[in-house]
Amino acid sequence: MALTIAAAPAKAETIEVTIEKLVFSPATVEAKVGDTIEWVNKDVFAHTATIKGGWEVTIPPKKAASLTLKTAGSVDYFCRFHPNMKGRLTVTSP
């Protein structure tokens, strides 16, 4: 009789990034493919999480918006309305 051991699949997580006073916090996030990043905007004006030539998430004032990560890699993002706001996502395979 053979014994088979299977690892349970990793559960996807939701990682919160707060936006307050024109700052992404934390500015650097490590995540896995399948995780969701949720940006929570505490400011009174809209922001974006934008990758040049890639995706853009618009986060309305006093609201949240999210994105599920589909590919591994490292990307820098910024707010299109406030270009000094910057963040970095490092996404690895599960």
Feature map (PLM): residue ranges:
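Extracytoplasmic copper-binding redox domains, predominantly the cupredoxin/blue-copper superfamily
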Residues: 2-94
